């Protein structure tokens, strides 16, 4: 009887594993398999718990993003209504607050930091009200004026650093995306080539649209010279890279898009629109019947919602209009590429294609200091947009704090580094020097 049961067990093992070597299996091996069975059954629970924690972490990040968008709007209100001094005082107070919470986290006082995070929305609104009401009176105070002036000078002198970091981060992201496209085609399926060509055509179309929009602005002679030089350089480098096999269409189109973006931002931030050059008839974006239906739907929703909530929505929409679209676009692009670099560099060090999303209790320096960096970057962009000519008597300080000059310097250095990398890379290489640590095998 035992022999029959044992033979049946062997038959089951053979049918499951499909290996004749298991015919010589003894009872000790079967006991080991039985002992490991509960561990295998417990893995789905662990996976569910891990996915649940990741979902909660992503939800928390979305809440943090929404809260920071509110801060962006409030800082724009401070600069628009209260003026330069009011905006500087508010951003300096926010910088001190976020830096204090970062120090609390670094020194292990996370409970106090979490308590401050819980009251962040209330504290931000209180700081805005205090800055709007008290800025006219404290502007005459020499200590407050000195702090605001020092904060303004520090932000303006960070302009070269922010622009150069943006250029280097953009180059690394472009090369990582180009390498990822090659990896998908070589290791997954050649059908990915269709999506790569589609993305490249979209990038080129967006670049041409941005350059077309530039024609509505008056362009100075130095800017016209830099536009022609940068566009000619990126076209020559892209043709050389694609023809030699050292770059692909994805990289070439993204580099062209980066130069077109730089040209557009320089002209929109520092150029005067020439409205007489383009006179276009105004058309409705949607047919009249659809517009009427949408208007009726919005009227119904506004009548249903409480009046207070409706007023809050109107206030937020009106406040969001105080933020210039070019400032918001530049801020979103700069933060996106810098954040992408924080995900790409660990992936390069670990020789993997991408870094899995995770948020542990022991946060890194980037996640702790990110609010301080975001406030500094955004305030720097606002100062560049609202006050493009820094009030410095020294020519050296004017050059150091000129965003227009450093945008061009960043673009030219990025193209130069990309050209050097293409020139010294081998034709058989499927990755670039900056991304050569990725594995294709």
UniProtKB/Swiss-Prot annotation:
GO BP: endoplasmic reticulum membrane organization; septin ring assembly; triglyceride mobilization
Bridged cysteine pairs (disulfide): none
Residue ranges of coiled coil: none
Keywords annotated in UniProt: Membrane, Transmembrane, Transmembrane helix
Segments passing through the bilayer: 62-82, 88-108, 112-132, 154-174, 192-212, 224-244, 247-267, 312-332, 335-355, 363-383, 399-419
Protein topology in the membrane: Multi-pass membrane protein
Primary localization: membrane
One cellular component (GO) term of this entry: perinuclear endoplasmic reticulum
Presence of keyword Transmembrane: yes
Subcellular locations according to the entry: Membrane
Superkingdom of origin organism: Eukaryota
Name assigned to this protein: Uncharacterized protein C23C11.01
Species of origin: Schizosaccharomyces pombe (strain 972 / ATCC 24843)
């Amino acid at each position: 009887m035992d022999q029959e049961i044992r033979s049946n067990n062997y038959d089951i093992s053979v049918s499951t594993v499909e290996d004749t070597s298991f015919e010589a299996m003894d009872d000790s091996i079967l006991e080991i398999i039985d002992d490991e069975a509960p561990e295998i059954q417990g893995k789905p629970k662990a996976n569910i718990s891990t996915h649940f924690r990741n979902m909660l972490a992503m939800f928390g990040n979305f809440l943090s993003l929404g809260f920071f968008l509110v801060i962006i709007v409030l800082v724009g209100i401070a600069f628009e209504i209260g003026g330069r001094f009011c905006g500087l005082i508010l951003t300096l107070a926010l910088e001190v607050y976020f830096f204090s919470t970062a120090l609390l986290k670094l020194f292990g006082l996370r409970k106090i930091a979490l308590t401050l995070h819980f009251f962040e929305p209330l504290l931000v609104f209180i700081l805005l009200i205090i800055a709007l009401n008290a800025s006219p009176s404290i502007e005459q105070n020499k200590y407050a004026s000195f702090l605001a002036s020092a904060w303004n000078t520090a932000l303006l002198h960070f302009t070269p650093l922010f622009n150069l970091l943006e250029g280097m981060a953009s180059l690394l992201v472009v090369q990582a995306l180009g390498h990822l496209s090659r990896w998908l085609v070589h290791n997954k399926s050649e059908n990915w080539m269709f999506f790569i060509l589609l993305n490249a055509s979209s990038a080129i179309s967006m670049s041409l649209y941005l350059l077309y929009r530039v024609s509505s602005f008056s362009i100075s002679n130095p800017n016209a010279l830099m536009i022609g030089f940068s566009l000619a350089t990126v076209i020559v480098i892209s043709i050389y890279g694609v023809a030699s096999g050292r770059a692909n269409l994805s990289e070439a189109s993204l580099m062209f898009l980066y130069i077109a973006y730089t040209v557009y931002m320089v002209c929109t931030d520092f150029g005067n629109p020439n409205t007489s050059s383009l006179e276009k008839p105004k058309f409705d974006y949607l047919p009249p019947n659809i517009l009427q239906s949408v208007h009726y739907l919005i009227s119904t929703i506004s009548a249903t919602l409480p009046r207070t909530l409706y007023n809050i929505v109107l206030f937020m929409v009106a406040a969001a209009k105080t933020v210039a679209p070019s400032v918001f676009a530049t801020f979103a692009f700069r933060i996106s590429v810098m954040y992408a670099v924080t995900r790409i560099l660990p992936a390069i060090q670990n020789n993997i294609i991408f870094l899995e999303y995770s948020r542990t209790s022991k946060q890194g320096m980037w996640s702790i200091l990110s609010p301080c960096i975001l406030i500094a970057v955004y305030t720097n962009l606002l100062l560049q947009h609202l006050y493009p000519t820094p009030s410095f008597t020294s020519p050296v300080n004017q050059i150091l704090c000129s965003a227009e000059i450093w945008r061009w310097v960043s673009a030219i250095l990025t193209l130069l580094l990309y050209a050097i990398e293409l020139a010294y890379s081998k034709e058989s290489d499927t990755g670039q020097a900056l991304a050569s640590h990725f594995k294709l095998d």
